[in-house]
Amino acid sequence: MNIHEYQGKEILRKYGVSVPNGKVAFTPDEAVKASEELESSVYVVKAQIHAGGRGKAGGVKIAKTKDEVKGFAEELLGKTLVTHQTGPEGREIKRLLIEEGCDIQKEYYVGLVLDRATSRIVLMASEEGGTEIEEVAEKTPEKIVKVVIDPAIGLQGYQAREVAFKINIPTKLVGQAVKFMTSLYNAFIEKDCSIAEINPLVVTGDGKVMALDAKLNFDSNALYRQKDILEYRDLDEEDPKEIEASKYDLSYISLDGNIGCMVNGAGLAMSTMDIIKHYGGDPANFLDVGGGATAEKVTEAFKIILSDQNVKGIFVNIFGGIMKCDVIAEGVVEATKQVGLTLPLVVRLEGTNVELGKKILSDSGLNITSAESMADGAEKIVSLVK
């Protein structure tokens, strides 16, 4: 689950991470009131959306007066902001963070991520802050410092000090930087984060180490024990199809292609997307119906897939282990009738009751193309949507 920058800073502040004073605003009048309460000579007006690249896209403004704050708020609120992470459709700005300005001397990058190769949390840092860390990794990878953290003992002070020196934090501020990194790590662990990214971390003119921006993502599977984090959820920032899918315990992620996929099992779903790409197609989604799908669940899955206007065909790829192929076949037939499906539909079934499942499909009288293998199914659906 993602949250807004201002929410992330609220969390970090509780852990002792230094952040600028700021207030959220939903209207221009609230923005002005926030600036009055901050009493700063310079204000930063920041669009709050779940995407990076806001500054380059015009979503971050510097105001020197309260009138400018109001003007920027009127300009940004209700505007659709398009960044490299939003896609061409962009995101509507519905809230702003009004912050006091900072006298920035130097920008750095500090982040905590889960490294799947080592199954450990990794602290990453760079003196090249304020830019996309992916760009730094591509152009100057030697400027990224990485520390693998032992989960049994956590981030140690000596590790944080080593990182601070390697990214050239001023010597007199190393102590602050160590406290910053260890506090960030504590927040990461205790709040079940999957990403905690500070870009930039800044050194200010008055000698402070501060998080100028904050991106926190959380493990959705841990939200049952993070009730306070769940309250930060902003459904306006989420894909309506993904929200609908969650109501039926379906794992759905929207993609940019035109071939809808309905599969059971995350591994098979990823393999299905790969093989569609192999045959020259583009998957429109990741959709895992799980191991206990009912006819109702399959019908809802079809409706969600078809709510994507880009979908030109559907590939159903099911391996019946716990789930029986005849149950899936009945669900596919019922769903096809309910939604009045006119798009090409290819179904590949394998496993428990596979012959019965295939018979149900063939006896339905519907325009359903049967596939003998995953490769056969992928090749057929790619051909049908061209």
UniProtKB/Swiss-Prot annotation:
Cell membrane is among the record's keywords: no
GO terms under biological process: succinyl-CoA metabolic process; tricarboxylic acid cycle
A cellular-component GO term for this protein: cytosol
Residues binding Mg(2+), per UniProt: N199, D213
Cofactor needs: Mg(2+)
ATP-grasp domain ranges (all copies): 9-244
Pathway annotation: Carbohydrate metabolism; tricarboxylic acid cycle; succinate from succinyl-CoA (ligase route): step 1/1
Its EC number(s): 6.2.1.5
Keyword terms, alphabetized: ATP-binding, Ligase, Magnesium, Metal-binding, Nucleotide-binding, Tricarboxylic acid cycle
Residues given in the record as ATP binding sites: K46, G53, R54, G55, E99, C102, E107
Similarity section: Belongs to the succinate/malate CoA ligase beta subunit family.
Protein name: Succinate--CoA ligase [ADP-forming] subunit beta
